[in-house]
């Protein structure tokens, strides 16, 4: 096992180097400007060039080409819009439907404040927030599944 020599902090040469910020690792290569100005832009440009090259050389079709003369019977939104689409579909009044759609993010904003005084992170020790979360999840799943069905079976999911 080798003996390591500890630095002598009373040495005036070492103190001068430490005052300049050179320390014991003054022989290394600094990150600025070498890495930040030369290596990082090359890596970023290379990544972008690879992505553009792959997109140009091998374009992939996303879905099937649209045919404006053959539209589907019922146009559905993307899957993450199914619950609010179902709200709009089932509520007869348009203004009420839009207000209910606006109530979804407003309700999500109020969930953290339900048990503001309760500082526990364990969901079993926060019964109100856990109940609201589970109820909202069940309602969102119910509305999402119902939006994929025809309008006459959408509220009951074809079960009743």
Curated annotation (Swiss-Prot):
InterPro entries: Cyt_b/b6_C (IPR005798), Cyt_b/b6_C_sf (IPR036150), Cyt_b6/f_cplx_suIV (IPR005870), Cytochrome_b_C_euk/bac (IPR048260). Component of the cytochrome b6-f complex, which mediates electron transfer between photosystem II (PSII) and photosystem I (PSI), cyclic electron flow around PSI, and state transitions. The lineage of its organism: Eukaryota, Viridiplantae, Streptophyta, Zygnematophyceae, Zygnematophycidae. This is Cytochrome b6-f complex subunit 4. The chain crosses the membrane at residues 36-56, 95-115, 131-151. Belongs to the cytochrome b family. PetD subfamily. GO terms for biological process: mitochondrial electron transport, ubiquinol to cytochrome c; photosynthetic electron transport chain. The keyword Transmembrane helix applies. Gene3D superfamilies: plastocyanin oxidoreductase (1.10.287.980), Single helix bin (1.20.5.510). It is found in: Plastid, Chloroplast thylakoid membrane. The 4 large subunits of the cytochrome b6-f complex are cytochrome b6, subunit IV (17 kDa polypeptide, petD), cytochrome f and the Rieske protein, while the 4 small subunits are petG, petL, petM and petN. The complex functions as a dimer. One of its GO terms (molecular function) is electron transporter, transferring electrons within cytochrome b6/f complex of photosystem II activity. It holds the Pfam family Cytochrom_B_C.
């Amino acid at each position: 096992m080798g003996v390591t020599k500890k630095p002598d902090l009373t040495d005036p040469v070492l103190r001068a180097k430490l005052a300049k910020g050179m320390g014991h690792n003054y022989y290394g290569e600094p990150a600025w400007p070498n890495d930040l100005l030369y290596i990082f832009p090359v890596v970023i440009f290379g990544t972008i060039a690879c992505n553009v090259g792959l997109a140009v050389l091998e374009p992939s079709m996303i879905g099937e080409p649209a045919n404006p003369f053959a539209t589907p019977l019922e146009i559905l939104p993307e899957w993450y819009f199914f619950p609010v689409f179902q709200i709009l579909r089932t509520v007869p009044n348009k203004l009420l439907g839009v207000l209910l759609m606006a109530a979804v993010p407003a309700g999500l904003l109020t969930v953290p404040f339900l048990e503001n005084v309760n500082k526990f992170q364990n969901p079993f020790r926060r019964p109100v927030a856990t109940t609201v979360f589970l109820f909202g999840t069940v309602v969102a799943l119910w509305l999402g599944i119902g939006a994929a069905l025809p309008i006459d079976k959408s509220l009951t999911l074809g079960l009743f």
